[in-house]
Structure formats: C-alpha cells, structure tokens
Amino acid sequence: MAHTEGVERDVSAALTFDVIDGTEVALLFAVSAAPIEQETLEVTIGDRDVPVEETRDRFGNRMHLLKDLPEGTVRLRYKATGVGQAEPPTVEPTDAASHLRPSRYCEVDEFTKVAAEVVGDRTGMAAVHAVVAWVHQHLDYVPGSSTVTDSARSTYVARQGVCRDYAHLTSTLLRAGGIPSRCVSAYAPGLSPMDFHLAVEALVDEQWVVVDATHLAPRASMVRIATGQDAADTAFMTTLAGRLKLTGIRVNAVANPGLPEENWEQTVQLR
C-alpha cells in the first residue's frame, strides 16, 4: 500500500457559462471529504453575487445548486488550499452487490466474454491489474475523440478516448469479471492537459483501491470530488432547468512538496 502522509494539495476550478432566465444547475467540483486549510467559492453574474445551496447527493458527494438564475454570464471560482489526506473510503455492506451492476455508460452484461478472456484465472489485485493493463494497451488517448454519449461499448469499438472512456471501459470489464467497481472524479496533480479527471475504484479484500488506465497522473496525490457508478453520477455540471452554454473552464491542481512517484503495480487508496 502506498503511503502519502505529509502530502498536501492545492486545487482550483473556474467555470464560465451563459444561461437563460430561470436556469437551474447542479455542480460537482468541491473537494469531497479531505481536510482543507482554506476553501473559497465565488459565484457571480455581472457584479451580483449568486446564492449557492450546498447539499449531498445519494452518493454523499458535495453538490452545489444554483437555482432560478437570471439571464447572463455566470462566473464561478472555487479554490481549496492545504488539502490533506481523507480517511480511507468506507466499504458499505451493499457495495459488492450494487457495484457489480450495469449502469448508464457501463454495459456490463455485454462484456462477460471479453472480461473472461482478459482476466483469465486471476483473482483479486492480479485480476484488477490485468484489466487496467489491457485497457492501457488497447486504447489510444485522443483528446476530442469522444462525446458525452459514448459508453464502454463504443469505446471498446473505437479503441480510443479520454479519461472518462478509459474509466468506463475499465469499470465495465472489472464488473463483468466479478470485481465490484465504481468511477470517481478527481483533481489530479500532474495531469496534462489539466482538467477534471475520472478514475476507477475496485473493491478488493474489503477495501476500495484506485486504478487509472490512462497513466497520466500519480494516483496518490489525486483528490476525490465525486463518486458514482459512472460519469452520469460524477459529471461536474448538470442542467436541471433552462439552458446553458459552457464558455470557459480552467482547472488546476498541485501537490506539495511535489508529485509522488508512481508504481502502477502498487495498491493505492484515494485519500
């Protein structure tokens, strides 16, 4: 198990989007559970502050709601500094069953044969590593190559995608191979180009371990934002009413005193 004591992260997100009158938005951008030295959030339209309601969704994620927005350009600025290590993710009695099931972007039932070929007779972390290695070797990371409607099925056919596509295919193969799995959005120091990131957690030996077939950022310095079955549960922005157009996004994440070394065969928990 990787040890990350002493690692602190500074993260930030800036979103700009145009809305029509009456628009309502649900946002997932805030650090989920890790201790934070200082956290700020500013949301404005023009020179007016926008009221923000914070709640928790069914997965326990920190969700921010913007309701009945007037027409205009919304500017959101979020910053969290001195982000420490959260407690290890808890394992609930229902996790094993619920995280083997298909979900919107993970067509588990269609991948039973493929998963059997990839996993073979491996079990536990050996099976997890086999799936992650297969996805890493068989997909090309190509920014702009997929859309929000792409799923594990279309990614398997296209053999290319971005982090969400890697995560969906990885999680689907794990579930199809009998390993409970879920997706997790995160701030990822070291990621290039910098953006919100989507990785995967697998339930092995009664603990959630994080894996990432993109190999684009060290797992030990990632900061959890949201947890769910797939991107339908972890998307950073969901329009609840009205209409919006995202016109700008800027994400930043750094690890202090520096990025940890990554060993992709090592067991890591997202803290």
Please tell me what each predicted stretch does.
Residues 81, 86, 90, 96-161, ...:
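Secondary-structure boundary elements
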Residues 133, 165-247:
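Hydrophobic/aromatic-rich core segments of domains that either
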Residues 1-85:
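Intrinsically disordered, low-complexity N-terminal segments that are enriched in acidic
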Residues 27, 88-94, 212:
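Short, charged, solvent-exposed linker or helix-capping segments at domain edges/interfaces
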Residues 38-42, 52-53, 67-68, 102-105, ...:
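Glycine-rich loops and low-complexity Gly/Arg-rich segments
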Residues 48-55, 61-66, 110-119, 217-223, ...:
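Low-complexity, flexible helical/coil segments
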Residues 29-38, 87-89, 154-160, 164-167, ...:
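Short low-complexity stretches enriched in small and charged residues
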